[in-house]
Amino acid sequence: MNHLLVADTFDPFLLEEATISTALTVPIDGHINKDFYPAEERGEDCIPWELQSFSKIKGLCFDLIKGKHTPLYFKFVLHMQPDKAAAMLTKAQVDPDIIRALVLTIRYDGEKTVLTTGCAYQTFTMDKSADTAWDKALKKYLDLKGISYEEL
Protein backbone atom coordinates (compact mmCIF):
# COMPACT_ATOMS: atom_id res chain seq x y z
CA MET A 1 0.00 0.00 0.00
CA ASN A 2 2.98 2.28 0.65
CA HIS A 3 4.09 2.01 -2.99
CA LEU A 4 0.61 2.91 -4.19
CA LEU A 5 -0.40 5.79 -1.94
CA VAL A 6 2.74 7.18 -0.26
CA ALA A 7 5.79 6.60 -2.46
CA ASP A 8 6.14 8.07 -5.96
CA THR A 9 5.97 4.63 -7.61
CA PHE A 10 2.77 5.25 -9.57
CA ASP A 11 3.12 9.02 -9.99
CA PRO A 12 3.92 8.67 -13.73
CA PHE A 13 0.37 7.39 -14.28
CA LEU A 14 -2.99 9.07 -14.84
CA LEU A 15 -6.12 8.05 -12.94
CA GLU A 16 -9.12 7.01 -15.03
CA GLU A 17 -11.19 5.86 -12.09
CA ALA A 18 -11.00 4.57 -8.55
CA THR A 19 -13.35 2.90 -6.12
CA ILE A 20 -12.47 2.73 -2.44
CA SER A 21 -14.62 0.76 -0.01
CA THR A 22 -14.09 1.26 3.72
CA ALA A 23 -16.98 2.23 6.01
CA LEU A 24 -18.34 3.93 2.87
CA THR A 25 -17.78 3.21 -0.80
CA VAL A 26 -16.37 6.20 -2.67
CA PRO A 27 -16.16 6.27 -6.48
CA ILE A 28 -13.70 8.71 -8.07
CA ASP A 29 -13.87 9.73 -11.72
CA GLY A 30 -10.40 10.74 -12.88
CA HIS A 31 -11.61 12.73 -15.91
CA ILE A 32 -10.75 16.39 -15.49
CA ASN A 33 -13.68 18.83 -15.58
CA LYS A 34 -12.00 21.53 -17.67
CA ASP A 35 -14.99 23.86 -17.21
CA PHE A 36 -14.00 24.12 -13.55
CA TYR A 37 -10.95 26.17 -14.56
CA PRO A 38 -10.86 29.72 -15.95
CA ALA A 39 -10.32 29.88 -19.73
CA GLU A 40 -6.65 30.88 -19.36
CA GLU A 41 -6.00 27.70 -17.33
CA ARG A 42 -7.66 25.28 -19.77
CA GLY A 43 -4.96 25.11 -22.43
CA GLU A 44 -2.81 22.08 -23.08
CA ASP A 45 0.09 23.77 -21.30
CA CYS A 46 -1.95 23.88 -18.08
CA ILE A 47 -4.02 20.70 -18.46
CA PRO A 48 -2.09 18.38 -20.79
CA TRP A 49 -4.31 15.30 -20.37
CA GLU A 50 -7.99 14.42 -20.07
CA LEU A 51 -7.25 12.41 -16.92
CA GLN A 52 -5.90 13.63 -13.59
CA SER A 53 -2.32 12.80 -12.69
CA PHE A 54 -2.34 10.08 -10.04
CA SER A 55 0.23 12.06 -8.03
CA LYS A 56 -2.36 14.83 -7.54
CA ILE A 57 -5.15 12.54 -6.35
CA LYS A 58 -3.33 9.87 -4.32
CA GLY A 59 -3.38 12.03 -1.17
CA LEU A 60 -7.17 12.07 -1.22
CA CYS A 61 -7.19 8.30 -1.78
CA PHE A 62 -4.77 7.84 1.12
CA ASP A 63 -7.01 9.92 3.38
CA LEU A 64 -9.98 7.70 2.48
CA ILE A 65 -8.05 4.49 3.26
CA LYS A 66 -5.94 5.41 6.30
CA GLY A 67 -7.08 4.38 9.74
CA LYS A 68 -6.95 1.38 12.01
CA HIS A 69 -8.97 -0.87 9.66
CA THR A 70 -7.82 -2.16 6.31
CA PRO A 71 -10.11 -1.31 3.39
CA LEU A 72 -12.68 -3.86 2.31
CA TYR A 73 -11.88 -3.25 -1.35
CA PHE A 74 -10.26 -0.82 -3.70
CA LYS A 75 -9.67 -0.56 -7.41
CA PHE A 76 -7.55 1.94 -9.31
CA VAL A 77 -7.60 2.11 -13.10
CA LEU A 78 -4.44 3.89 -14.21
CA HIS A 79 -3.15 4.89 -17.65
CA MET A 80 0.48 5.35 -18.52
CA GLN A 81 1.05 8.98 -19.56
CA PRO A 82 0.62 9.14 -23.37
CA ASP A 83 4.13 10.46 -24.07
CA LYS A 84 5.72 7.74 -21.93
CA ALA A 85 3.48 5.08 -23.52
CA ALA A 86 4.45 6.22 -27.02
CA ALA A 87 8.16 6.14 -26.13
CA MET A 88 7.90 2.66 -24.61
CA LEU A 89 5.95 1.28 -27.58
CA THR A 90 8.33 2.85 -30.10
CA LYS A 91 11.29 1.34 -28.26
CA ALA A 92 9.53 -2.05 -28.48
CA GLN A 93 9.01 -1.49 -32.22
CA VAL A 94 5.24 -1.17 -31.88
CA ASP A 95 3.35 1.62 -33.66
CA PRO A 96 2.05 3.87 -30.84
CA ASP A 97 -0.74 5.20 -33.08
CA ILE A 98 -2.67 1.92 -32.75
CA ILE A 99 -2.97 2.33 -28.97
CA ARG A 100 -5.40 4.64 -27.16
CA ALA A 101 -4.03 3.78 -23.70
CA LEU A 102 -1.82 1.39 -21.75
CA VAL A 103 -3.92 0.51 -18.72
CA LEU A 104 -2.97 -0.83 -15.30
CA THR A 105 -5.74 -1.95 -12.96
CA ILE A 106 -4.79 -2.38 -9.30
CA ARG A 107 -7.45 -4.25 -7.33
CA TYR A 108 -7.45 -5.21 -3.66
CA ASP A 109 -10.18 -7.59 -2.43
CA GLY A 110 -9.46 -7.53 1.30
CA GLU A 111 -6.84 -10.28 1.08
CA LYS A 112 -4.63 -9.81 -1.94
CA THR A 113 -3.72 -7.17 -4.49
CA VAL A 114 -3.91 -8.02 -8.19
CA LEU A 115 -2.35 -5.91 -10.94
CA THR A 116 -3.79 -6.41 -14.42
CA THR A 117 -2.40 -4.87 -17.59
CA GLY A 118 -4.37 -4.03 -20.68
CA CYS A 119 -4.12 -2.17 -23.94
CA ALA A 120 -6.94 0.01 -25.24
CA TYR A 121 -6.59 -0.16 -29.02
CA GLN A 122 -7.80 2.47 -31.48
CA THR A 123 -9.26 -0.32 -33.62
CA PHE A 124 -9.49 -4.09 -33.57
CA THR A 125 -6.25 -5.95 -34.23
CA MET A 126 -5.04 -9.52 -33.95
CA ASP A 127 -1.51 -8.28 -33.24
CA LYS A 128 -0.85 -8.50 -29.51
CA SER A 129 2.72 -7.19 -29.59
CA ALA A 130 1.65 -4.05 -27.70
CA ASP A 131 0.20 -6.21 -24.90
CA THR A 132 3.42 -8.20 -24.72
CA ALA A 133 5.56 -5.04 -24.67
CA TRP A 134 3.39 -3.49 -21.93
CA ASP A 135 3.54 -6.63 -19.78
CA LYS A 136 7.31 -6.79 -20.16
CA ALA A 137 7.78 -3.07 -19.42
CA LEU A 138 5.59 -3.23 -16.30
CA LYS A 139 7.44 -6.26 -14.92
CA LYS A 140 10.74 -4.45 -15.47
CA TYR A 141 9.32 -1.36 -13.72
CA LEU A 142 8.06 -3.36 -10.73
CA ASP A 143 11.46 -5.06 -10.43
CA LEU A 144 13.19 -1.67 -10.58
CA LYS A 145 10.94 -0.36 -7.78
CA GLY A 146 11.51 -3.48 -5.66
CA ILE A 147 7.91 -4.66 -5.81
CA SER A 148 7.57 -8.42 -5.66
CA TYR A 149 4.86 -10.06 -7.72
CA GLU A 150 3.63 -13.44 -8.84
CA GLU A 151 2.42 -13.96 -12.40
CA LEU A 152 -0.97 -15.61 -12.67
Give short role names for the model-derived ranges:
Residues 1-54:
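Charge-rich, low-complexity N-terminal segments
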Residues 23, 40, 84-86, 114, ...:
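Residues in flexible loops and secondary-structure boundaries
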Residues 44-112:
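Surface-exposed, low-hydrophobicity interaction/linker segments
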Residues 113-152:
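Mixed-charge, glycine-accented linear interaction segment located at domain edges/termini
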